[in-house]
């Protein structure tokens, strides 16, 4: 009986996708969040000045970056075998793990004044400008996947890292699946 229960649990795992992910959006957040976000929890801050997005960064589709140890598509329906996306493509060693991210977005953002975007502020190097995004998570995509800046990890080149993107143009850094902006 125990084997039957374990087998049933293993084979009954539901695919994580836009229809099955948890979406919990408060009624009092701006309409944009209600209309476009999925796979997230969205709440207005106590002050009413920020919208807080809570998300797990798991991609709501199939990818080879879900944990493949002892899995098949029958016991992890989100895992698929690696598929080449072209010459030079490869699977990086990262494996997706559920995360707990919170991003706070001002309800009424104010643009920075006097910022000039040129080659010195967008030079592909981290920490050379006060206007660069930090490394790591900088936001949330509409489907609850985390966003990283447009750069690769220090020592890597984003054009080379792109060869490790999956069918949806994402990949993990360690266990954090993400897109680059």
Residue ranges and their predicted role:
Residues 174-181:
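Histidine-centered catalytic micro-motifs
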Residues 162-169:
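Short, recurring structural edge motifs at helix starts
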Residues 8-12:
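Sec/Tat signal peptide C-region and signal peptidase I cleavage site
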Residues 156-161, 181:
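Short helix-loop boundary/capping segments
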Residues 13-156:
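Solvent-exposed N-terminal domain segments of exported/luminal and surface proteins
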Residues 97, 171-173:
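Solvent-exposed loop and beta-edge segments used for protein-protein assembly and interaction
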């Amino acid at each position: 009986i125990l084997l039957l229960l374990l087998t049933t649990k293993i084979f009954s795992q539901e695919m994580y996708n836009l229809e099955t992910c948890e979406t919990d959006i408060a009624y009092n957040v701006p309409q944009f969040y209600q209309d476009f976000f999925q796979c997230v929890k969205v709440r207005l801050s106590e002050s009413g000045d920020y919208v807080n997005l809570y998300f797990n960064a798991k991609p709501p589709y199939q990818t080879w970056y879900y944990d493949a140890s002892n899995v098949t598509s029958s016991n992890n329906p989100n895992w698929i075998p690696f598929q080449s996306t072209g010459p030079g493509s490869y699977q990086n060693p990262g494996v997706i793990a559920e995360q707990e991210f919170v991003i706070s977005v001002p309800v009424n953002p104010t643009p920075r004044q006097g910022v000039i975007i040129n080659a010195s502020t967008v030079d592909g190097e981290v920490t050379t400008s006060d206007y660069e995004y930090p490394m790591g998570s900088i936001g949330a995509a509409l489907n609850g996947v985390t966003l990283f800046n447009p750069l690769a990890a220090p020592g890597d080149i984003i054009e080379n890292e792109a060869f490790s993107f999956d069918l949806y143009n994402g990949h993990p850094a360690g266990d954090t699946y993400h897109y680059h902006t």
